[in-house]
Amino acid sequence: MPAESTFDIVSDFERQELVNAIDQARREVATRYDLKDTKTEIVLSEKELTITTESEMHLAAVRDLVQTKALRRNLSIKIFKFGPVQEVSGGRVRQVATLQRGIPEDVAKKLAKLIRDHFPKVQPRIQGDALRVGSKSRDELQAVIRLVKERQDEFDIPLQFTNYR
């Protein structure tokens, strides 16, 4: 009888690719005609991205620019969870985006229930901010991957599959 095969469902992104996308966005903001004199700041910290500029119109343009640059570097735009627009001193506006990393517990429970409902012989286990899925049949695991990829739009986080053993 074969040993159990497993894989992990995670939500993560390549940090260096995000840094590169933000650098490209900063360069484009500095050279683009409609954004050149807006004193726009794009600040990337460990867990969030802050965009500060002169008006909500410029803010929307910079936000779209950042998302476009991220998409071109194969990053999902679901990693950005944008908060409300805030007024700051000098008539400027700011928006903070939290960077999504790891699967929140409520999403992990929904994923585990989805997998259990469709595949009773497969065991999904929540391990911190990842979901480990195990089964004796590799075919069932591949079917689970197909199911989760098809239903990925139901979850507001990007999902990847790693450690397939």
UniProtKB/Swiss-Prot annotation:
Fetch the InterPro entries from UniProt.
DUF520, UPF0234-like_C, UPF0234_N, YajQ-like_sf
Q: Which UniProt keywords apply?
A: Nucleotide-binding
Segments spanning the bilayer are none
Cellular-component GO terms for this entry: cytosol
MF-aspect GO terms: nucleotide binding
Top-level taxonomic group: Bacteria
Give one Pfam hit by family name.
DUF520
Q: What does this protein do?
A: Nucleotide-binding protein.
Family assignment from sequence similarity: Belongs to the YajQ family.
Q: Which HAMAP family match?
A: YajQ (MF_00632)
Question: Cross-referenced NCBIfam families, in alphabetical order?
Answer: PRK05412.1
What's the protein called, per UniProt? Answer: Nucleotide-binding protein Rcas_1283
Native source organism of the sequence: Roseiflexus castenholzii (strain DSM 13941 / HLO8)
